[in-house]
Amino acid sequence: MDSKVTIGLIQAHHDTNGDRPVEEHKAAAIAKHISMIREAKKRGAQIVCLQEIFYGPYFCTEQTAKWYDAVEEIPSGPTTRIMQDLAKELGIVLVVPMYEQEFAGIYYNTAAVIDADGRYLGKYRKHHIPQVQAGPAGCGFWEKYYFRPGNLGYPVFDTAFAKVGVYICYDRHFPEGARALGLHGAEIVLNPSATVAGLSEHLWKLEQPAHAVANGYYVGAINRVGREAPWNMGEFYGQSYLVNPRGEFVAMGSRDHDEIVIGVMDRDVIREVRNTWQFFRDRRPDSYGDLVAQ
């Protein structure tokens, strides 16, 4: 397996007004992202990650049953199958965040992981579900209305190019799962997000570099861009990035443009950092009982 792997992180505006029907949102966003995935492949990407619930707006700023119609089963739903065919055609790994239905009324914020031969490898369900006011009165991250907390643990997927973990948006504020992904062997953790200026921006470039350093892996952080009507809860500030285990930014996107952020993950850097900072060796799990006792 090559030491170096090219990572593609896709950040994009959602171009359809929230008042439009759900299927119109999905069709337009899927077509847009297929085009961007193809461009990422042309630019050398081997692993490509899309933004949180890529085929819709960030609808969690309101609490409206309309958006339950955006759910799909994973992997049997149509979007997973489209992305399996695309991954196989292009020979790339895809991480595809979607709104998942387990069965009627049981819904998750989920990312499917698809290998370079088109095989579905599994999924990660977002663990930490926010309920936080943000932006104008009435707007917020009202995710408990839409999602149950994830129940599949912190899997690491052994893909054709790297061992990949996933941590979705609000998860990034919690170091425990980030550590679990490291202990499970992740070489890179991908964090598809939807977050706005004013609430979390000053944390955006702090928390995930810290996870990368503490766990000796790369982190790919993805955020959408622009403002989404009719809610206008705030500016999705983009700046998707790849950060290495030294805490150095390898690549970073713009604040306000559709963009494919390309960066290189290097296993030699992972090995060098882990051999220098022996954080896994020096852990004291025998003393951490308080973390799960309350």
Which residues make up each language-model segment?
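CN hydrolase (nitrilase-like) catalytic-core segments centered on the catalytic cysteine
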Residues: 75-95, 163, 168-260
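Active-site catalytic loop in hydrolytic enzyme cores
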Residues: 72, 85, 102-187, 197-210, ...
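Metal-dependent catalytic neighborhoods of phosphoester/phosphodiester hydrolases
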Residues: 53-72, 103-107
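Short, glycine-anchored, charge-dense loop/turn motifs used at functional sites
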Residues: 7, 113-121, 243-251
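Acidic/histidine-rich helix-loop elements
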Residues: 14-27, 135-137, 142
